[in-house]
Every structure is written in structure tokens, then in C-alpha cells.
Amino acid sequence: MVEEASKSEQINITEVWTTTWETPYIMRLALSAGIGGLLFGYNTGVIAGALLYIKEEFGEVDNKTWLQEIIVSMTVAGAIVGAAIGGWYNDKFGRRMSVLIADVLFLLGALVMVIAHAPWVIILGRLLVGFGVGMASMTSPLYISEMSPARIRGALVSTNGLLITGGQFLSYLINLAFVHTPGTWRWMLGVSAIPAIIQFCLMLTLPESPRWLYRNDRKAESRDILERIYPAEMVEAEIAALKESVRAETADEDIIGHTFSDKLRGALSNPVVRHGLAAGITVQVAQQFVGINTVMYYSPTILQFAGYASNKTAMALALITSGLNAVGSVVSMMFVDRYGRRKLMIISMFGIITCLVILAAVFNEASNHAPKIDKRDSRNFAKNATCPAFAPFTASRSPPSNWNCMKCLQYDCGFCSNGAQEYAPGACIVQSADMKALCHSKGRTFFKDGCPSKFGYLAIVFLGLYIIVYAPGMGTVPWIVNSEIYPLRYRGLAGGIAAVSNWMSNLVVSETFLTLTNAVGSSGTFLLFAGSSAVGLFFIWLLVPETKGLQFEEVEKLLEGGFRPSLLRPTTKENQVETP
């Protein structure tokens, strides 16, 4: 079995820069492929701001929560299909060709959204982009992983995660840049065509993965690429490892066959693949059920829930969370090969659970202390302006004590804040563009998604802390684990299965978030995510081994007998890898 590797394989960011400085070709490969991560991040993040303006242009979107959820989640639905096809396509045609196809899909989707004249056209464009996101989500880290020396593999794969978060941060900047430009959301959604074109051109100049080439009997090309990546004295050892993997793969195929269904059956009958999938799917599902993409897809909306009514203000504040996510990815690059994948994820999950519980408490307090309804102001605001649900109480001596701003919004009405003091009682009125304009004309603020709150700043603080603890661990590490935990012969297939599990979980979360907040409130929704995060933490501890510093072939040996955490493992000299 593999001996404990942490001391001998420790690495710091200085070595990463030294290696890539001496061999700049490695960084060129990583950054070019990583643009797929940038596109992934941009196209999933840009909708957070664009949705606010899509709602303003299309009344039916503003009035239908389910339509908003479809626009947001259709990219995720497309990504499920893209990831599923991508696994097969990667193995059949190679990593490089898969990236090129993803770029074409990104470009087509962007063009469709730019010319959209109705919500269904936006949905179609989001679907096309989703196909590209799904392929990029598994292909970019896989390509980088197979092009990287083992000692800095984790850090270089983290560049893909960094570019995902960088793409999300860029999308928020672009959103702010086009706030006052005619066609706001069209520009926001269309800008993604530019990096797609750039990556397409760059990938035309780069080679295929040496591992895929060797598997497809293009050994001379594979050797040529390895000689450009590894020092001369390491090339033969790497080729020997590839030869052994391909020999084992060929032997397997002679037994299980060559078709997709045969490979799937063979993969599931292989204990190494089964144990790898248990770990890979666990981290992918856990990544989504901490609720991260509710923050990334809906962060301006969440901040409006917290009391920031202005679109521009909400987007500017949301930029903070996106920026912290990008910074956290840099931190991951610094520590993932020093402290290990497993430890970073476990620490990250503890922090996530803490922040989610506190956020639930913050939103609960904000709801309980929302401004009361001023009966006279609601009745006299304008002719036929009073919220229909509140109108019967305007004639009573005093309205029910449970009527506050939050109660008003629950009946799909709007709250016009008190002109003198935002936290004082205000008017509960009909929600319409005319009433919003009238409220603003009186120098007051109109709220329709959240209420004025003294707790709003706490929501920003703990959303920021949530991102800080998420990004270095659960943000990037699941993709690293899935790029190195499967045998070469099943890597594309198993990586596709794990990526599909990620996107299916993502779809569940993004498609239900607004519905959940309507049903149980923001507080209850964050509490649900805290509970699902606790479940995810347990299964990560139970099923996910440490792969830091291991060759792909060593990972296979680690998984042969199944992984058990040290607490559940008999103490023997044959313990595989020290894990917490």
C-alpha cells in the first residue's frame, strides 16, 4: 500500500512559481485551458445581476417566481447534459477537442441571448451556454491535471477554480459597468462571447493530453509533450507509469468490452472506481448542498431580502462576496498541496455550517423587527393604492400586531418606507411600476423583495465570512479530487458521472431557492442548508481519502481495499495514508 506521503510531498507556492518559471509552457497550458473555468464562472454568475433588469423589461418574469428560477437554472440543466456527454466525448475525441466544442456552445448561447425578444429565447440561450458549462466543468480541470507535474498538480488545477471565481467576479464588474447602458442585460449576457473566441484560438495552438495520446497509440506525440513538461530525468518514469496504466486498461477492455454500456458496467464492477465514485460524488454533491450557488446566482436578490432595495446597491455589495470567492481560490492554491485536500474540505465545512446558522439567525431577527405598517399612510397614499390584503384593516382602530413590512410583502404588495425614518412604520401598497415611481417621487424607498433592516450589515458580514471559509476548501478542492481519484481508463467516464451529480445537485438548489424562501423564509432556507452541510461533512469524513502528492497509480492502490477514516480503521503498519 502507499506509504504516508505528507512530509516528503509537502510543497509551497514558491515551488509552483519556480517550476512554471523554469517551464513557462506548463503555465501557458494551464491558463489557456483555465479560460473554460472563466467562462464557467462568468455564465453562472452574470445572471445574478442580469435577472434584476430582465424582470424590469419583462413583466411576466417579475410576476412569476418559477420563471425567474427557470432562467437562472436552465444553464444548470444544460450543464447536466453537457457533463454527461462530455465524459464520453473526452474519452472518444480527446480533452482538447472537448474544450473547442464547449467554446462554440458558449459563443452560440451568448449570441442567442443578445438578440432575445422574449423570455423563452433567453432560456434557450442559457441552455446552450449550459451545454458549454457542463463540458468545461469537467474537461478544463482534467486537461490541466493531465498536463501537470504531480508535485504541483493540485495547485495548477486550482487555477481552474481561481478562474471560475474570477469569472464570477468579472461578471459582477460587467454588470455594474452596464447598469446605465441601454440594453443592460443584453450586454451583460453577451460579453461572454469574447473569452470563448480567445480560448478557441489558443486551444488550436495547444496539444492534446499526453495521457490520452498514449492511450490512443500516439506514443511519439505523447513523449514529445512530456519532454516539454517534465525534466529530462523524469520523462522515462512518467512514460513507464503511463505504459502500466494503458496495459491494465487494455486488459480490462479485453474482458469488459469497448462500448459505453460495457465500460459503465465495467466501471461499476471495479472496486477502485466504485470507491472513487463514492468519494467523487460525495464532494460534488456536498459542494452544492452547502448552498453556495444560491449566493452566487441570487446574491443581489439575497441582499435585497436583507433590506438593500436598489439594484445598483445590491449588485455593488454582491461584488464583495464574489471578490472574496476569488481571493479564497488563491488561498487554496497556496495550501492544497501543503495541507491536503481532505483536511481543507473538513475545516471548510465546519466554517460553512457556523456561518449558515448565524445567517439564519440574522434573517430571523430582520423579519421579526421589520417596520410596522402605518394604517393612515397606507390608506391615504394614493387612490386605490392600499394593498388589497391590508385594506380591510384600514378602517379598524388598530391593525393586527403581526402586520409589518414582511407580512405586507408576503401578500405580493410593496412597502413604501417612512420618509423621515426608514425603520419607522410605512405604507403597505399595491406592487406596481406606478406605485414604485410614486413612492420614489416622495423621496421614499420602495421595497418589494425585502424590508428595511438594521441587521442588513450583518448579512453582508456573514455572507462574506461564508465565502471566505467556502472558497479555499469546498470551492476548489472537489474538482481537484475528481481530477485525480479515478483510474486513467475510467477517468473521463467517472469524471462525467461525478460532474453530472454536481450539476443535478446544483439544479435542485437553484431551481428551488426562491420557492423555499417564499415557503419558509430566508431564515428557514439558510437553516436547511446548514443541516445539509452537516450531512455532507459526515460523508466527506467517512468516504474521502487524502490524495495529496500521490501519483495517479498510487491513488488506485489507495482505493483498492476501500477507504476508511483512521477512527474506524484498525491500527496496523499497513495504514495507507494518514488522514484526520
Curated annotation (Swiss-Prot):
<feature type="transmembrane region" description="Helical; Name=12">
    <location>
        <begin position="524"/>
        <end position="544"/>
    </location>
</feature>
<dbReference type="Pfam" id="PF00083">
    <property type="entry name" value="Sugar_tr"/>
</dbReference>
<dbReference type="InterPro" id="IPR050814">
    <property type="entry name" value="Myo-inositol_Transporter"/>
</dbReference>
<feature type="transmembrane region" description="Helical; Name=5">
    <location>
        <begin position="161"/>
        <end position="181"/>
    </location>
</feature>
<feature type="transmembrane region" description="Helical; Name=9">
    <location>
        <begin position="344"/>
        <end position="364"/>
    </location>
</feature>
<feature type="transmembrane region" description="Helical; Name=2">
    <location>
        <begin position="69"/>
        <end position="89"/>
    </location>
</feature>
<feature type="transmembrane region" description="Helical; Name=3">
    <location>
        <begin position="104"/>
        <end position="124"/>
    </location>
</feature>
<comment type="similarity">
    <text>Belongs to the major facilitator superfamily. Sugar transporter (TC 2.A.1.1) family.</text>
</comment>
<feature type="transmembrane region" description="Helical; Name=7">
    <location>
        <begin position="289"/>
        <end position="309"/>
    </location>
</feature>
<feature type="transmembrane region" description="Helical; Name=6">
    <location>
        <begin position="187"/>
        <end position="207"/>
    </location>
</feature>
<keyword id="KW-0472">Membrane</keyword>
<keyword id="KW-0812">Transmembrane</keyword>
<protein>
    <recommendedName>
        <fullName>Probable inositol transporter 3</fullName>
    </recommendedName>
</protein>
<feature type="transmembrane region" description="Helical; Name=8">
    <location>
        <begin position="316"/>
        <end position="336"/>
    </location>
</feature>
<keyword id="KW-1133">Transmembrane helix</keyword>
<keyword id="KW-0813">Transport</keyword>
<comment type="function">
    <text>Plasma membrane inositol-proton symporter.</text>
</comment>
<keyword id="KW-0769">Symport</keyword>
<feature type="transmembrane region" description="Helical; Name=11">
    <location>
        <begin position="493"/>
        <end position="513"/>
    </location>
</feature>
<dbReference type="InterPro" id="IPR020846">
    <property type="entry name" value="MFS_dom"/>
</dbReference>
<dbReference type="InterPro" id="IPR005828">
    <property type="entry name" value="MFS_sugar_transport-like"/>
</dbReference>
<feature type="transmembrane region" description="Helical; Name=10">
    <location>
        <begin position="455"/>
        <end position="475"/>
    </location>
</feature>
<feature type="transmembrane region" description="Helical; Name=1">
    <location>
        <begin position="34"/>
        <end position="54"/>
    </location>
</feature>
<dbReference type="InterPro" id="IPR005829">
    <property type="entry name" value="Sugar_transporter_CS"/>
</dbReference>
<dbReference type="GO" id="GO:0015293">
    <property type="term" value="F:symporter activity"/>
</dbReference>
<dbReference type="InterPro" id="IPR003663">
    <property type="entry name" value="Sugar/inositol_transpt"/>
</dbReference>
<feature type="transmembrane region" description="Helical; Name=4">
    <location>
        <begin position="127"/>
        <end position="147"/>
    </location>
</feature>
<dbReference type="GO" id="GO:0016020">
    <property type="term" value="C:membrane"/>
</dbReference>
<dbReference type="InterPro" id="IPR036259">
    <property type="entry name" value="MFS_trans_sf"/>
</dbReference>
